[in-house]
């Protein structure tokens, strides 16, 4: 069982996924001991956050920026599956899980399937979005419905190719229990 599966399966809890239920998730290293106030949010459902790291299965070693600036800048080797993890929620419960990995992996469904049990389903529900912040068409953002046992989750996946930052780019996977209809309409995506 992968670390990502163990984290997203906690969203299935009937009475809500309490912050403390994530405390001892195998394979997750938390940066904070508890949720922190989110000053960037104006939504009650993301008024708190907690960050950590986990390793996605099925990736090898790659070069990434070492974090230094200017003449000191260099690269270091890490497993491409090393990913940042952010939980977002209200004061009591987690409502969404974001996973951000270095490097562009546009085959979103394949990456997610490697992390979930064999019986899981990953079904594309929207893509070919009409607009992004830069004003052009967004061919990269995709939305999925994920079925695991008798439970349903939704996934928004997108990439940033690193253009302009000279970095390797990254891929973000955002898991929620709530259907992202509003977000799909906002991005003018074609529903399937």
Task: Spell out what each predicted region is.
Residues 171-192:
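Short, low-complexity, Pro/Ser/Thr/Gly-rich segments in the mature regions of secreted, periplasmic
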Residues 164-169:
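Short, surface-exposed linear segments at secondary-structure transitions and domain or protein termini
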Residues 89-93, 102-106, 149-150, 160-163, ...:
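Short, flexible beta-strand-to-coil junctions
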Residues 58-141:
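Long, charged/polar, surface-exposed segments that mediate recognition or autoinhibition
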Residues 1-88:
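N-terminal leader/targeting segments
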């Amino acid at each position: 069982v992968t670390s990502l599966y163990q984290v997203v399966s906690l969203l299935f809890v009937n009475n809500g996924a309490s912050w403390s239920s994530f405390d001892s998730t195998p394979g997750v290293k938390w940066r904070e001991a508890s949720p922190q106030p989110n000053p960037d949010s104006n939504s009650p459902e993301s008024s708190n956050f907690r960050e950590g790291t986990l390793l996605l299965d099925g990736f090898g070693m790659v070069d990434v920026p070492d974090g230094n600036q200017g003449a000191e800048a260099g690269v270091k080797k890490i497993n491409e599956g090393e990913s940042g993890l952010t939980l977002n929620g209200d004061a009591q419960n987690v409502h969404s899980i974001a996973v951000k990995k270095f490097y562009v992996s546009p085959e979103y469904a394949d990456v997610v399937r490697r992390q979930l049990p064999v019986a899981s389903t990953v079904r594309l529900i929207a893509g070919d979005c009409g607009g992004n912040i830069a004003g052009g068409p967004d061919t990269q953002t995709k939305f999925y419905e994920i079925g695991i046992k008798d439970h349903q989750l939704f996934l928004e996946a997108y990439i940033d190719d690193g253009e302009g930052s000279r970095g390797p780019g990254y891929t973000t996977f955002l898991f929620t229990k709530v259907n992202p209809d509003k977000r799909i309409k906002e991005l003018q995506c074609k529903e399937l």
